[in-house]
Amino acid sequence: MAYHLLQRNRNGGLNLAKALNEAMTHIGHCNACRTFTEEEECTICKNPRRQISGQLCIVEMPEDIQAIEQTGQFSGRYFVLMGHLSPLDGIGPREIGLDLLQQRLEQESFHEIILATNPTIEGDATANYIAEICHLYNVKVTRIAHGIPVGGSLEMVDGTTLSHSFAGRRDFLL
């Protein structure tokens, strides 16, 4: 990309540099959920309708919020970990903000915590750790389903995903 901008679009490169500088200067983290925002609280956290559901969805990264929002299936609030537990990499509970999550659970009332970490070993370990914390607050804890993607074929799915699909099966309603 750098070569292209230098050879063919220097003004575009300058505009990109200016936009990146603006973003780095003016965008920070939401005080409530930790996603990126230009204000102290993001638009989701400021929305009073989001509090009605009593649900808190915990995700690994800010872009996970966008993916969930595009489905239109969730109308609660979020908490962004900014990663997952990875002790070998020196990433423990404090590095992903679990102390801040506990503060939030103490200050706010939730009916359900939805764990939407990635379906990886680290994501599962993080979800299990968070579930233990949440049970201290007597709140319902659920995990998003994992399984076969729409349009996927069984022969192309790995054994772990297929096992999760069988374990998470549900009644077929007509």
From Swiss-Prot:
SMART domains, alphabetized: TOPRIM (SM00493)
Any Pfam family: Toprim_4
Domain of life: Bacteria
Gene Ontology biological-process entries: DNA recombination; DNA repair
Residues in the signal sequence: none
Listed InterPro entries: DNA_Rcmb_RecR, Rcmb_RecR, Rcmb_RecR_Znf, TOPRIM_dom, TOPRIM_RecR
Cited Gene3D superfamilies: 3.40.1360.10, 6.10.250.240
Domain Toprim residues, every copy: 54-149
Keywords: DNA damage, DNA recombination, DNA repair, Metal-binding, Zinc, Zinc-finger
Zinc finger annotations (C4-type) as residue ranges: 30-45
MF terms (GO), sorted A to Z: DNA binding; zinc ion binding
PANTHER family in UniProt: RECOMBINATION PROTEIN RECR
Similarity remark: Belongs to the RecR family.
Known role: May play a role in DNA repair. It seems to be involved in an RecBC-independent recombinational process of DNA repair. It may act with RecF and RecO.
UniProt name for this protein: Recombination protein RecR
Organism: Haemophilus ducreyi (strain 35000HP / ATCC 700724)
Lineage: Bacteria, Pseudomonadati, Pseudomonadota, Gammaproteobacteria, Pasteurellales
Gene that this polypeptide is encoded by: recR
